[in-house]
Structures are given as structure tokens and as C-alpha cells.
């Protein structure tokens, strides 16, 4: 059990500093990485490329964004009412 927790902590990677978002409030950073992930995923799927290159954006937004925001945005994307341009 303790080894499992140590492994999780060792492998945990949080969002690195992004100079586009120097302030303490990281809401915009969260939003931008969510959009970037889905744009990257859409572009790579259209080209028939490997979607795993987009994984960095997903890890960053998963680290920064509250789960409730992500689930709401996912629901809105599925419904076609998402306000962002993907």
C-alpha cells in the first residue's frame, strides 16, 4: 500500500509554469489547455496521426481544471453547445 502511494507521488506531474499566464489565477490557463487538447486531438485524428502527442495538454488541463468544469465542458461538447472554438 505504501509503495503504491510512493509510486503515484513519484510519477505525478503537475502543470509547469506557462509565461502566457503569469498571474495566480489559472482559470484562463485551464481553459486554453482544454481547448488546445481538443484542437490537437481533432487535427491529429483528421490527419490520421497519433493522438498521443496531445497527451501533454490533457495532463495540464486535468491538473489545473476542477473536475466539475471539465465534465460540464464535455457535456456541452457532446450536445453541440460548447462556446469554445475547437
UniProtKB/Swiss-Prot annotation:
Modified residues (N-acetylalanine): 2
GO biological process: oxidative phosphorylation
PROSITE patterns assigned: CHCH
Protein name according to UniProt: Cytochrome c oxidase subunit 6B1
Keywords: Acetylation, Disulfide bond, Membrane, Mitochondrion, Mitochondrion inner membrane
PANTHER family in the cross-refs: CYTOCHROME C OXIDASE SUBUNIT 6B (PTHR11387)
Modified residues (N6-acetyllysine): 62
Species of origin: Carlito syrichta
Localization per Swiss-Prot or TrEMBL: Mitochondrion inner membrane
Gene behind the chain: COX6B1
Bilayer topology annotation: Peripheral membrane protein
Pfam families cross-referenced by the UniProt entry: COX6B
One GO cellular component, as annotated: respiratory chain complex IV
Subunit structure: Component of the cytochrome c oxidase (complex IV, CIV), a multisubunit enzyme composed of 14 subunits. The complex is composed of a catalytic core of 3 subunits MT-CO1, MT-CO2 and MT-CO3, encoded in the mitochondrial DNA, and 11 supernumerary subunits COX4I, COX5A, COX5B, COX6A, COX6B, COX6C, COX7A, COX7B, COX7C, COX8 and NDUFA4, which are encoded in the nuclear genome.
Domain of life according to the entry: Eukaryota
Family: Belongs to the cytochrome c oxidase subunit 6B family.
Pathway the protein acts in: Energy metabolism; oxidative phosphorylation
Domain CHCH: 27-73
Disulfide bonds: 30-65, 40-54
Free-text function comment from the UniProt entry: Component of the cytochrome c oxidase, the last enzyme in the mitochondrial electron transport chain which drives oxidative phosphorylation. The respiratory chain contains 3 multisubunit complexes succinate dehydrogenase (complex II, CII), ubiquinol-cytochrome c oxidoreductase (cytochrome b-c1 complex, complex III, CIII) and cytochrome c oxidase (complex IV, CIV), that cooperate to transfer electrons derived from NADH and succinate to molecular oxygen, creating an electrochemical gradient over the inner membrane that drives transmembrane transport and the ATP synthase.
Motif Cx9C motif, residue range(s) on this chain: 30-40
Residue numbers covered by motif Cx10C motif: 54-65
Amino acid at each position: 500500500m505504501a509503495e503504491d502511494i510512493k509510486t503515484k507521488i513519484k510519477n505525478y506531474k503537475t502543470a509547469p509554469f506557462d509565461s502566457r499566464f503569469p498571474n495566480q489565477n489559472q482559470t484562463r490557463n485551464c481553459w486554453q489547455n482544454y481547448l488546445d487538447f481538443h484542437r490537437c486531438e481533432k487535427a491529429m485524428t483528421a490527419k490520421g496521426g497519433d493522438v498521443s502527442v496531445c497527451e501533454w495538454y490533457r495532463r495540464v488541463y486535468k491538473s489545473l481544471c476542477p473536475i466539475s468544469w471539465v465534465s460540464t465542458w464535455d457535456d456541452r461538447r457532446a450536445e453541440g453547445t460548447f462556446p469554445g472554438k475547437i
